[in-house]
Every structure is written in structure tokens, then in C-alpha cells.
């Protein structure tokens, strides 16, 4: 979102808010390779283990979790336009934690959009390999209430940004497999 400064990175006055978004939708069955539950697992293992308070080698077992998700699968146009669900994870969470829910909703005819709330997520890995670490541990901070309010306001703005991008996807202004397949009246 080039219109918002990133307040989690006060050391970089030019930093703009970035979001990582993952999408599930009704798709044509195919034999393409299924996506892993977590991308960049080696990068994520340490922070997942810290959040869960268990040894990091346990987190490496997450690679055994199988999904039904396929990258860029053709849209199943039957049932379109699709109602939309936007998933917002909890503090230290991440978009992939809701994969089974998102897959189920997509199998029922929904387009599901889940984001990492950057710096509130356990760790965000962007397509270029850059990382946004978790920066929301403010327990005991004297201004924790006002900081949490700012975080919630940021999350609301994240969702509003995604909603605006959905309009661009639907219209074709932003190229995406779901161009023309979204029901913007059912979010």
C-alpha cells in the first residue's frame, strides 16, 4: 500500500506498508503439485518454535502437513461470481494457519483472501525474499493500550486496502485469475 507509511519501521522513513496475501478459490481439479502448508519453512521454523515455546526442530515437522492447494490453478467458473471471505489472523499468527478453513470455504464456492498483517504476523516472507519480523511484543509496555489501538487501526486499514484491491481484481485493473469472478456485494 504505497499510500501508507510503515509505522513499525521508524528507522526507515521511506518504508511503505506491504502485505502478503494468499488466495484460495474454486478451481478446476488438476494433478499439479500441491503447495506446502508453510512456504519458507526453514526461515519460519525458529520464530514458530519461539511463539509456540517448543524446540525449532519440532517446527520442521510442519513440512509433513499436506494441503489441497495448487498455485495458479484454473478457476472453476461454475458458481461464479464467488462470495468473498477475508481472513485476518491473530497476534503472532500468519495467513497459513487458516489453510484448512480457506480450502474448505473455497470448496464450497467462496473466494478466500488471507493476509499476513506485517510485523503483527509471526514472520512474513515476501516474494523477493525480504522478511518482516514480529514486532508486536509489547507486554508490560507503559503505552501498550495506545499501541494496541494503533495496531488494530492498522489491521482495519489492511483489510480496507485488500477490499479496494478486490475491486481492481474484479474489474481487471489488477491482473488475476479471479478477474470478473468476484461478488463484491458479498464480502
Pin down the residues of each PLM region.
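Alpha/beta-hydrolase active-site loop
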Residues: 119-186
Amino acid at each position: 500500500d504505497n499510500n501508507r507509511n510503515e509505522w513499525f519501521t521508524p528507522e526507515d522513513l521511506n518504508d511503505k506498508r506491504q502485505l502478503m496475501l494468499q488466495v484460495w478459490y474454486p478451481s478446476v481439479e488438476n494433478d499439479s503439485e500441491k503447495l506446502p502448508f508453510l512456504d519458507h519453512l526453514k526461515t519460519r521454523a525458529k520464530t514458530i518454535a519461539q511463539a509456540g515455546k517448543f524446540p525449532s526442530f519440532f517446527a520442521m515437522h510442519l513440512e509433513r502437513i499436506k494441503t489441497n492447494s495448487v498455485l495458479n490453478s484454473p478457476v472453476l467458473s461454475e458458481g461464479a461470481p464467488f462470495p468473498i471471505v477475508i481472513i485476518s489472523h491473530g497476534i503472532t499468527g500468519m495467513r497459513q494457519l487458516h489453510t484448512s478453513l480457506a480450502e474448505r470455504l473455497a470448496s464450497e464456492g467462496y473466494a478466500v483472501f488471507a493476509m499476513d498483517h506485517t510485523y503483527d504476523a509471526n514472520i512474513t516472507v515476501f516474494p523477493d525474499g525480504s522478511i518482516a519480523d514480529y514486532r508486536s511484543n509489547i507486554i508490560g509496555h507503559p503505552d501498550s493500550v495506545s499501541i494496541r489501538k494503533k495496531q488494530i487501526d492498522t489491521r482495519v486499514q489492511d483489510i480496507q486496502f485488500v477490499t479496494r484491491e478486490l475491486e481492481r481484481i474484479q474489474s481487471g485493473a489488477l491482473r488475476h485469475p479471479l478477474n470478473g469472478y468476484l461478488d463484491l456485494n458479498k464480502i
